[in-house]
Amino acid sequence: MAIDENKQKALAAALGQIEKQFGKGSIMRLGEDRSMDVETISTGSLSLDIALGAGGLPMGRIVEIYGPESSGKTTLTLQVIAAAQLEGKTCAFIDAEHALDPIYARKLGVDIDNLLCSQPDTGEQALEICDALARSGAVDVIVVDSVAALTPKAEIEGEIGDSHMGLAARMMSQAMRKLAGNLKQSNTLLIFINQIRMKIGVMFGNPETTTGGNALKFYASVRLDIRRIGAVKEGENVVGSETRVKVVKNKIAAPFKQAEFQILYGEGINFYGELVDLGVKEKLIEKAGAWYSYKGEKIGQGKANATAWLKDNPETAKEIEKKVRELLLSNPNSTPDFSVDDSEGVAETNEDF
């Protein structure tokens, strides 16, 4: 429908005045805004990248990863950092828990010599550091480990036993308002790791809650619930964890999908194992009995041998990965069955700890 000529002139004058006052690009038609094309970074897990619908975690946004203890939260964020560094991006790790193991990070592929690391004294200091890094425009990925460890200054200066109702929630709420715009302008990905607490007296529904108030839940573009669902064994020895991640919230694609993968101790996410499974599922890799073949060439007897072959042949692995991504990301209807029936079992966010 054509707009009245006088209205068009008035609109053009108004847009010109806004751009003159606030700068070029302060207002534009949505179709002209090329920054709306979401750039993503791989999570290190192929099935999780596909479950997210965009091929990874979105740049310029806030992401929350939460789950029980020893579920793989920090491992997943370190894999994101490793993937980002491979693309030449600069990463920072805000270690509020004072528990980052550089030796483990190196084993996961993180270049620790070029990883910025801070161990802040207070929650306010941690969030101010995040804001300063985002405003610099020079840092691409920031990880905060964890929201539960972001202790307000008043609580640190007070005594154990003092009541500080809602302090952390107010601190996070103020930080989210300040950070969201700066992250978008600098195209910086900010990942918050969060812990789970139990609500007292819940008779029906899920008693789980995440710490730090409601603001993070609203401002996060992606929320991931990560759980350990089993053990990976070699004979009698436990060598890793079977892990399930649910996409609880997703502003860039359809939510409530899930991915399952293995986290191997000392190695991280078993990417090549996922590649074998998804390759077979999409008929890119042929499986006859225990033998796996690719383009008529046998690559191994048993999944472990096929995985080892792909690890030794990275060019073939990249070729299969590219085909899997093209098949599953270009056509959402062909996505493997990662769906969750509903949002039951998703942790809510409480006002305080």
Swiss-Prot record:
One GO cellular component term noted in the UniProt record for this chain: cytosol
Region (Disordered): 330-353
SMART domains in UniProt: AAA (SM00382)
Binding site for ATP: G67, P68, E69, S70, S71, G72, K73, T74
Pfam family membership, one: RecA_C
Subcellular location: Cytoplasm
A GO BP entry: DNA recombination
This protein's name: Protein RecA
Function noted in UniProt: Can catalyze the hydrolysis of ATP in the presence of single-stranded DNA, the ATP-dependent uptake of single-stranded DNA by duplex DNA, and the ATP-dependent hybridization of homologous single-stranded DNAs. It interacts with LexA causing its activation and leading to its autocatalytic cleavage.
PANTHER family noted in UniProt: MITOCHONDRIAL DNA REPAIR PROTEIN RECA HOMOLOG-RELATED (PTHR45900:SF1), RECA (PTHR45900)
PROSITE patterns xref list: RECA_1, RECA_2, RECA_3
InterPro entries xref list: AAA+_ATPase, DNA_recomb/repair_RecA, DNA_recomb/repair_RecA_CS, P-loop_NTPase, RecA-like_C, RecA-like_N, RecA_ATP-bd, RecA_C_sf
Family to which the UniProt record says this protein belongs: Belongs to the RecA family.
Keywords (A to Z) from UniProt: ATP-binding, Cytoplasm, DNA damage, DNA recombination, DNA repair, DNA-binding, Nucleotide-binding, SOS response
GO molecular function terms attached to this record: ATP binding; ATP hydrolysis activity; ATP-dependent DNA damage sensor activity; damaged DNA binding; single-stranded DNA binding
Organism: Shigella sonnei
Parts forming coiled coils: none
Predominant subcellular localization, coarse grouping: cytoplasm
Ranges of biased composition (kind: Acidic residues): 339-353
